[in-house]
Amino acid sequence: MKNILTTCLFLCLLLTVHAADNPNVKKLFTVTSGELKLTFMVGTDNRLYQLGFGDAAREVEPPAKMPSREWEFLPPYGNGVLTEPAIQATHVDGNTSTELHYTGHRTETLAPGIEQTVILLKDPAYPFTVDIYIKCYTDNSMMEIWNTVTHNEKGKVILHRFASAAPVVKAKEYWLSQFSGNYKREATLNEERLSEGVKILDSKLGIRAHQMRIPSFILSLNGPAKENEGEVLAASLRWSSSFQFAFDVDWNKNLRLLTGMNPLGSQYNLERGGTFTTPAILYTYSKQGKGEASRRFHRWAMANAIRDAEKDRPVLLNNWEATHCDFDEDRLKQLFDGARQVGAELFLLDDGWFGNGPYSRDDDKHGLGDWDPSTKKLPKGLSYIAKEALKRKVGFGIWLEPEMVNPQSELYQKHPDWIITQPKREPILGRHQEILDLTRPEVQAFEWDIIDKTLRPNPDITYVKWDCNRYITQPGSSYLQPADQSHLWIDYNWALYRLMDRFAKGFPNVMAMLCAGGSGRVDYGAMPYFHSFWPSDNTDPLGRIKIQWGFSHFFPANTISAHVTRMGKRHLKMAIDVALSGAFGIDLALDKATAEERAQIADAVKL
């Protein structure tokens, strides 16, 4: 510890000397997290420049001349900035340019190994401020960066762009690894060398936003990424909605990394005195290749971003592949018996347990939104069937999709104005369903009531699978004002986090899996409220192993739900081996399995 303090003091003194010797420098300071360091310079023009981002051991000296504007840490639109802007606003008087000057910074220790620096910026001509937050988790060389925008102008300021961070990297070459794909082939790793210009990775889906691309990437410096050697930066955005990553290689071969919410269709009208907060972007740095960067993400997540990270995940049996929506109490009891025989610890009752009369959930066209248990399938109710599982020493969990509704439902007939849609347009369905407008307070109350009335009277339900089976195609709200329609993408997601937080705090003993038609919602914005996630509906082990490997770059194995199924008609041993690399589960009709197959599964459960 004494050596670390001595080194930090030496670097601070060294920077002070350099600042005193350079007529262009007003202040130099660093923010360091283990091996990762950000070096800042405040110029005599009062702008905040970034001199380095990367290896903490690398000394960065201020330039002999005033840096050009492309080195501004959070470049605002207009007034001489020619690169991709991080912040763009229209002020109340119509001025579309913003100037940001440094007014100070402070650093505080939040907990052992966690420090936070806040850098204060202000427009010299307007009461418009941006505060940059940099939280350092020093044990894992991790930085978490976000910012807040506030103003006191006499009216609304329109925010057009609002990046979470925009650091600049300097290297000879940049190799980008992204994790893209589509339904049943999610998180497929693709690596390419970046050339001069702007490369965009994004999602425009709103919810189930990560079906085609997860909000994470790896940047290898000076060559393709290797497992155990070479410099890499790994990053992940804590946001479950539309996002955008812009990789801007300029004429001097510098790379700016603009990351955050997708600004498309999302301009935000910020009221006087209001605060706009961006999601956080996580960065870690490694000189030992992407393997060490991945392990740092895992260690950080286990300590900071996963619910009950050290708690054992139950081996569960899911009924979906065995029954779909066609089951009754006797069939479920047969499945409970199968779960007990192989040693499964929990039975998860999937879709199909709710809806009555003409809206009975007998297929995916009916009943979504009507969350009363089916009197046809479960005449004795949820409490009875949960206790039947417990009699067999098997826990009981349930499937919920609180954000969705079928047009063929009682809820839709009563509240057609509750859905996300656009006026004068034919509704576009996804999986025969619509999305409830979570910006609307009545919907927020309704969705909480779904969770509360399902779980509170039924304390034997100890697990929830929270699903979300479509994305937004017609962004519009009958609740939001016409001028604020573009708020939908952002306000929906913040409301969703509030609901998830209420669920996690209200039912601390109920474990939860995050699902969205596969991996449509996998990020560290949502994971603090969940124990695991469903990475894909592709459970063919040959395809699944690639998907799980992709997610493992950022997420620990105990968060990646992995089930044994018949998909692909592979050898059962292969399906078991692949599933054992994650949070193990079973999705089979065990009563139709052979004795040898049940024995194989039972042996796997014991592991």
Go through each PLM region and give its residues:
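Bacterial N-terminal signal peptides
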Residues: 6-16
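Boundary at the C-terminal end of the N-terminal hydrophobic targeting segment
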Residues: 17-21, 521
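Polysaccharide-binding surfaces and accessory modules of carbohydrate-active proteins
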Residues: 21-32, 36-40, 44-248, 264
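Active-site and adjacent substrate-binding regions of carbohydrate-active enzymes
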Residues: 35, 135, 147-149, 324, ...
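Short Pro-Gly-centered flexible turn/kink motifs
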Residues: 95-100, 268-287
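Aromatic-lined carbohydrate-binding/catalytic grooves of carbohydrate-active enzymes
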Residues: 308-449, 458-459, 463
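Glycan-recognition and catalytic regions of carbohydrate-active enzymes
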Residues: 589-607
